[in-house]
A protein has these predicted regions:
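Residue-level signal for protein termini and structural transition zones
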Residues: 22-23, 27, 326
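A generic structural signal for well-ordered coil/turn residues at beta-strand boundaries
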Residues: 30, 66, 115, 249-250
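Active-site-adjacent loops and short helices of periplasmic peptidoglycan-processing enzymes
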Residues: 17, 43-208, 214-219
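A short, hydrophobic C-terminal helix/tail in secreted or cell-surface proteins
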Residues: 327-332
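Domain-terminus/edge residues, biased toward the C-terminal soluble/receptor-binding domains
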Residues: 186-190, 198-326
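A short hydrophobic/aromatic micro-motif that marks alpha-helical segments and, especially, helix-coil
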Residues: 37-38, 112, 170, 235-236
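Short, Lys/Arg-enriched N-terminal segments with co-localized hydrophobic residues
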Residues: 1-20
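Sec-dependent N-terminal signal peptides of Gram-positive bacterial secreted proteins and lipoproteins
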Residues: 25-44
């Protein structure tokens, strides 16, 4: 059909309106795509932890720490930043309690245990030597109080009381500890008790396996850091003789002396010597430093601080968002 001169402007306006509408819908669709990409970017972003060096080879230096075994791990990705003889089996002493805490928080997570549940101390739990909070037989404490006793003061008696409460016996609890360790891929670990007091040669782990279980505890149950970062706190003993206050002081001195330290667990026996798994956070980086068999308690803290300093100075955490950057498209 041939349009008359009068109808041409009207037709043009109709075509223009359709073109404008098409452009409008294209703009809306593009805006939606951009919004969706922006929203889902974090879901697809990969946290990557890399040393700020020309190569990413793990540092190996006998000069960094005195301890015969040690490892430094980034918590979010599990990247090993530094290691020294990290797979030699050694006695962990009270660092054992990290696995005990994992099982406690597993029970809390499943709902079979609550923070305000009460636990009665048995004669066996009371009989524990070493580091303890001096629970009396028949003494009743809440789960939360006993968690504090374990993670702050390294109470062997509190650990056994919790083990018996959860599984009926320490032996059964230890069986679950070994199953949990196997599930985490801790290939060089075997537990004989729930507190690390034993000096049995069949109770062992490695620096690497300790880092693995430390990472499991703090990433799956970050609430533990609320307790492990406490420097001092009082609990109340409630016994037949009455009530009395008892002070807990954190065995991890890095809580006060190292910037960003938020826990985690110390350990020492005549066989294990002095051990430590320390967690520190700065900005978006969380590091786990493990040292085993240091000659004295000062060296374990010095070695852990040295590894943490190395990690925070040499490494950075970034998010891989290349999928949505123009530079990435140009590189392709």
């Amino acid at each position: 059909h041939i349009l008359s001169p009068i109808n041409v402007p009207a037709a043009c306006r109709y075509i223009d309106r359709r073109e404008n509408m098409r452009k409008k819908w294209i703009s809306i669709i593009c805006a939606v795509i951009i919004m969706v990409c922006t929203i889902i970017t974090p879901a697809y972003a990969a946290g990557i932890f890399l040393p700020e060096e020309s190569n990413t080879k793990q540092a190996e230096s006998t000069d960094l720490i005195e301890a015969p075994s040690g490892i430094l791990m980034e918590a979010q990705t599990g990247t090993v930043v530094y290691q020294k003889d990290a797979d030699t089996r050694r006695s962990p002493a009270s660092i054992t309690k990290i696995m005990t805490l994992i099982l406690i928080f597993d029970a809390l997570d499943k709902g079979s245990l609550k923070m305000d549940d009460t636990v009665t101390t048995s004669a066996h739990a009371k009989s524990m030597g070493g580091s303890q909070v001096f629970l009396e037989e028949g003494e009743i404490q809440t789960v939360e109080t006993l968690i504090k006793c374990i993670v702050i003061a390294s109470g062997n008696d509190a650990s056994v009381a919790m083990a018996e409460h959860i599984c009926g016996s320490e032996q059964e609890f230890v069986r679950h500890m070994n199953e949990r360790a196997e599930g985490l891929g801790m290939k060089n670990t075997h537990f004989e008790d729930c507190c690390g007091l034993t000096e049995s040669p069949d109770h062992y782990t490695t620096a690497r396996d300790i880092a693995i279980m430390s990472r499991e505890l703090i990433t799956k149950y970050p609430k533990i850091l609320e307790y492990s970062s406490i420097w001092m706190e009082n609990i109340t003993h409630v016994t037949r003789q009455g009530t009395k206050e008892f002070g807990l002081t954190n065995t991890n001195k890095l809580i006060r002396s190292y910037e960003g330290c938020v826990g985690l667990k110390t350990g020492s026996t005549s066989i294990a010597k002095y051990c430590l798994s320390a967690v520190a956070k700065r900005n978006d980086i969380t590091l786990i430093a493990v040292v085993l068999a240091t000659p004295d308690y000062k060296v374990r803290f010095k070695d852990a601080a040295s590894m943490l300093n190395y990690g925070f100075s040499k490494c950075s955490l970034y998010i891989d968002c290349l999928l949505y950057t123009s530079d990435a498209a140009d590189d392709k």
